């Protein structure tokens, strides 16, 4: 499962491209500078996750399937800034805590660093989507569900909720529909301060 999560690092640069494409359209002027900074963050995230993948090794089948998912996100017709927001809020905000629970020290450190950036990204993208009146289509939501289900597919039912597939799928659903996932509040007891301990009314809430 961790190697599937790592394989989705291939989504980092496309998310940056989604934001870059949006900058060429109707994005509000005041949001442009921070969105341009977010694009640079995605490049750094791709590099950092690449180092982790090198250390862990990759699953060739998972890599191929992740690239197919990346292409599906790229080709989806919804607005690019909306795709970026959904991917970061309801996919990455699930995978990063999963890496913190299931990964080694290096993976936990990288996920914490990325998380601090992602809180800004989601806040910015959410505000831009609201300003433009954008809402995810049913087909984009279906793609979101398929993506997180693919990552967590190797997990089954477990008495340890952090190894239970339904726990993570439900977390993605709640982040998508409610903007919060209270079931992830235990991450506040992880070794390092988690990104979702920072108060921001525009962010998904975990507690």
For the regions a language model picked out, list residue spans one by one.
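Non-heme di-metal
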Residues: 1-207
């Amino acid at each position: 499962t961790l190697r599937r999560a790592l394989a989705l690092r291939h989504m980092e640069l496309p998310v940056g491209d989604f934001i870059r494409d949006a900058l060429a359209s109707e994005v509000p002027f005041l949001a442009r500078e921070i969105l341009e900074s977010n694009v640079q963050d995605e490049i750094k995230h791709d590099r950092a996750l690449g180092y982790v993948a090198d250390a862990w090794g990759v699953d060739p089948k998972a890599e191929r399937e992740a690239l197919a998912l990346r292409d599906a996100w790229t080709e989806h017709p919804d607005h690019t800034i909306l795709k970026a927001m959904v991917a970061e809020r309801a996919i990455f905000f699930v995978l990063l805590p999963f890496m913190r629970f299931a990964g080694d020290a290096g993976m936990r450190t990288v996920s914490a660093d990325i998380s601090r950036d992602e809180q800004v990204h989601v806040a910015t993208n959410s505000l831009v989507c609201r300003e433009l009146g954008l809402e995810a289509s049913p087909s984009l939501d279906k793609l979101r569900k398929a993506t997180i289900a693919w990552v967590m597919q190797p997990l089954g039912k477990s008495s340890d909720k952090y190894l239970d597939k339904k726990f993570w799928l439900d977390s993605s659903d709640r982040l998508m529909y409610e903007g919060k996932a209270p079931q992830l509040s235990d991450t506040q007891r992880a070794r390092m301060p988690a990104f979702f301990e920072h108060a921001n009314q525009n962010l998904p809430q975990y507690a």
